[in-house]
Amino acid sequence: MKWQLLTQKRHVLGKIFTIAVLTGCTGMLCVSCNRSQDVLVTEIGVSRPNRLTPKTSKAGEFYIQGQNQHAKGNSKLAIAAYSKSISLNSQYAPAFKSRGLAYFDVGNKEGAIADYNQALRLNPNDAETYNNRGNARASLGDQQNAITDYNEAIRLANNYAEAYNNRGNARATQGDKDGALADYTQAIRIDQTYSVAYNNRGNTYAYQGYQQKAIADYNQAIRLNPNFAPALNNRGNAFAATGDKRSALQDLQRAAAILDKEGNKELYQQVMKNIEELGR
């Protein structure tokens, strides 16, 4: 996609990467935003597996099996274990919540939402589940209901940096750039080491044409996480927008090398397209 931000011989690249955090950082999943060709990179995490105790119920045992499988990246096996847990105890909110994460992991967003609904019916004060349901709704293009969920997550936990970040993403998708900036800034106030929020605020500054502010935010994101390939790609995009093709190429090549090493073929190919566009 071409951002209409430049004049004369300056260059701008085709893709920026926006990060939405669910609950942790154990994996990455790509989904496309409805209103643009940007790429939403979602970091998917599961809770650390609990240790079995002599008092653990059968439902609890299957729940812990599910956590162990999910932590290993075996989402389908995790779903099977969570389902067994639920069949033994239909009031077990953590199993619905965790199965929702696993469904999201395999691309079943509707199934994820259904499970989050059940988890919230059983535990209506769980801020994390509201955040997770918001992410599932946002991935389906339902930004307004996603924002409603993020609002509730923030009401229940007013220092929930990830919920502010995710609400910022939804607002940015709706075109509310000022609202997005406010949310990203609040996320950073809560957690000054939050590289994801720096990256996303940088994207919003870049979209508005404030390339130097964008570069400053990308610098912070990369300082906090030197192997943060999306931020390297995005800083390269901003450098290209200022006419600094040399710095842009360096960042894009670093991003491509990291993504190639990680085996993230889709994002690697997009960065390579950015490099190709830069040479035009």
Feature-to-residue mapping (PLM):
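N-terminal secretory signal peptides that target proteins for export/translocation
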Residues: 1-12
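Conserved alpha-helical positions within TPR/SEL1-like repeat arrays
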Residues: 60-71, 83, 94-105, 116-117, ...
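Terminal, low-structured helical/coil segments at or just beyond the last alpha-helical repeat
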Residues: 38-51, 246-280
